């Protein structure tokens, strides 16, 4: 019985160490994901603002075409 306890204890110990290492790597990956998400938000806001400016210019040109009295 004692001879089986040592290998099982060793297996448990090694499994615990590998599990803790995996959790540390997972935690490090999650931090990188937050930075990526922030960068994506910044890029999305830039695209959205450019789209708004484009839409405003197009609507102004349409309004000028209908009204007929705009400066070019």
Curated annotation (Swiss-Prot):
Family: Belongs to the frog skin active peptide (FSAP) family. Brevinin subfamily.
The keyword Ion transport is annotated on this UniProt entry: no
Alphabetically ordered keywords of this record: Amphibian defense peptide, Antibiotic, Antimicrobial, Cleavage on pair of basic residues, Cytolysis, Disulfide bond, Fungicide, Hemolysis, Secreted, Signal
Pfam families per record: FSAP_sig_propep (PF03032)
Expression (tissue specificity): Expressed by the skin glands.
Signal peptide positions on this chain: 1-22
Keyword Secreted in record: yes
Prodomain positions: 23-39
Disulfide pairings: 64-70
The protein, known as: Palustrin-2CG1
Major localisation: secreted
Function: Antimicrobial peptide active against a variety of Gram-positive and some Gram-negative bacterial strains. Has antifungal activity against a slime mold isolate. Has hemolytic activity against human erythrocytes.
This protein's GO CC annotations: extracellular region
Coiled-coil intervals: none
Biological processes annotated in GO: defense response to bacterium; defense response to fungus; killing of cells of another organism
Record's subcellular location: Secreted
């Amino acid at each position: 019985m004692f001879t089986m306890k040592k290998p099982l204890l060793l297996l448990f110990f090694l499994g615990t160490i590998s599990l803790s290492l995996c959790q540390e790597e997972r935690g490090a990956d999650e931090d990188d994901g937050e930075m990526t998400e922030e960068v994506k938000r910044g890029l999305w806001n830039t695209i959205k603002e450019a789209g708004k400016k484009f839409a405003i210019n197009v609507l102004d040109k349409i309004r000028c075409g209908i009204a007929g009295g705009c400066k070019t």
